[in-house]
Amino acid sequence: MDSNTIRIFSFCGGGTKGYGSNRFMKKFIQQWGIPQADLWKYADVMCGTSIGAILASGYSFGKTQDEMESFFTTYAKRIFTIRTATDIATGSHNASQDSYRPDLLSKLAIIATNDSFYRSAYEDSNYGHNILQQVLVSNFGNSTLANFKTPVVIPAYEEDMKRYVVFSNFNDPAYFIGNNESIVNVCRASSAAPVYLPAHNFNGHYYSDGGQYANDAILAAINIGLTVKPNANRIVIVDVGTGIGNMSFDGSGTETGLEHTAVRLFGIMNIAMTGSEEWSRYYLDYLSNRLALDVYFYKFQPKFPVDFANEIDNSTTAWFTQLSNLIDTHYTNESDKIASILTHLTA
């Protein structure tokens, strides 16, 4: 790559809707004409939050979009499922059904106990966060951030210290931590969505989802890009969102005041997470169109129809098929913009 251009790829959080982000990248890479496993060779910096952290880690580690797709189509249904009443009554440690999600009242009951929806009940349980841990280990083993092939930025929240942190393999301890931390731990930290998955504990600290404050880590990625390529005069950014919609309780079937309150609170969380993405979009759009800087920016961010199930723990085959169709339609509708950013990437 030339030394005059900084190329950045950002992947936002959104749970299983990250399947759409990976599908976008699969189509984008195919249109670009480069091997799937070689994306890192064409990126100066990658960043990601929550599921975006897992995608950015995979791509920077040399994983293909086909490989990352199995995270959703094969394993999500076991991460986002719980034990049935029969499973519990019979004393089973395991969940007998795929994609068996708690309903709204059950979720409220779990929240009331300060627990997470998809916490595995036992260390040997075949569902929940145990499966997330197993899948990450099978993909990254004991590798650390230092094994990434390109600089990566991953935000998380350090709960016990009430501190916002940014993990990176870029060595600048004044601004980043975890250069030699395991990829598994960092991905678990950034993807521990409150109430959905338990906070992840390592090195004496508890971490939860970076999407609580930085669902799009693009600004930190730009800073690293400017540092590793101080003489660059062009910045090209591909920022991949998981779509705009209701990321949590949809409010259907609510009857009590408590239920309506829960819907409202989770709606606010949705606004906060999506809002951080849209604020980054606003900043970068202004930067590229109004200031005398050579910045080229594309945001892939489909707007989902009101009848689409947008909660971040959907995982059925039918749902992934529906999401795939929506992504394909948006990709087609954005063909001119996508062709334009590819021109700048390859210039």
Can you say where each PLM-predicted feature lies in the sequence?
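Surface-exposed acidic, glycine-flexible loop patches that form ligand/cofactor-binding
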Residues: 1-2, 34-40, 137-152, 226-231
